Amino acid sequence: MNAGEVEQAPYLQAKGWTAQDYFDQYQAIQQQIFALAEVPFPGPQRGEEDFTFIDLFAGIGGFRMAMQNNNGRCVFSSEYDKFAQKTYYANYGEIPFGDITQDDTKSFIPQEFDILCGGFPCQPFSIAGVSKKISLGRSHGFDDEKQGNLFFHIAEIIAVHRPKAFFLENVKNLVSHDKGNTFRVIKETLEGLDYSFDARVIDGGYFVPQHRERTFMVGFDKRRYGEGVGFEFDQIIIPDQKPNVGSILQTDVDPKYTLSDKLWQYLQDYAKKHKEKGNGFGFGTITPESTTRTLSARYYKDGSEILVPQDGLNPRRLTPQECAALQGYPIYPINTQNRDHSFVIPVSDNQAYKQFGNSVVMPLVQAIGEVLRNQLLNLDGRNIELRDRIGAAI
């Protein structure tokens, strides 16, 4: 971030600060944070990056890690949840700004940056979220007053700042929600801002041992790059072999993750009842060679969607560390032997389960981000040779 990037911030002007005042304070404080905190994922230094990006609805930083691994530098982040902010700070050395719907928060966004990244809240559009809201008589999709309109704040930021590109993520059901009308509105809104729009549903199971289909949307500024520009999803490098869940399972796991007799009996009875009715609801056990079901934010409640069998014992939940690895985050000693480059979990188990259940498959976002980075460098006439990765293990 530089002084020129914050000249437009009205909140700073209201406080009597100049852009240079803010820039000097920001740089000094940020360097102190990096030096004192010794965070595992600080990202490239200013001036050494290939592109800049902002991280909206940042969660625990799945987009940030992925884009930093492609030599991008984050110049703004926003996340409303205080527990996710804590995890974000522990790993990246920055506390994200809060509610992105507030003008004061938006005023801190640099005037210029290259890519807008955002995995905007999926509950209004997910199958599980919609089903629950319907059963409770609540609105869903764009009619959800709390979360359904958050996309339009993204559109507003794109319209005001005109980044070179956007990179968005949401649930698979976004494409079919409300008979396709929701997706149509998103597409037409972004195209109406003179951006290209390409989207694809991709399963994270090619990168991690988890079935997790998500909708990815990428677009370029057509005013800058012309009408023919578009994102090349076919250039994404997909691993030759899918990983299995045995690669992320720990041994000698704390007994607290083993299901109680009462909970295990309840899950078995619940599954039996629904099986007799012809429904598919129930718990999901895994084998070392298998791929798990989709990890959800409700995993902390009973762990039923992903249970690990144990000889002579009730099955157990995944540990938070295993959940981190299941989403592709490097965490010692499961998928990295570098203690200094291991994801930090500074919150309770329940909060960690929610955070990883809400997160993205980081290596998949990294793979898409690599193509996006290369296209931007090519469009801007810069060298597209890949630099050494800062890197997370895939």
Feature-to-residue mapping (PLM):
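Conserved small-residue
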Residues: 59, 88, 116-119, 154, ...
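Active-site/binding-pocket entry motifs
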Residues: 122, 126, 223, 301, ...
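Short clusters of hydrophobic/aromatic residues that line enzyme substrate/ligand-binding pockets
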Residues: 100, 125, 174, 208, ...
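C-terminal target-recognition/interaction regions appended to catalytic cores
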Residues: 1-28, 33, 39-40, 262-394
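Core alpha/beta nucleotide-donor-binding catalytic domains of modification enzymes
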Residues: 18-162, 172-176, 181
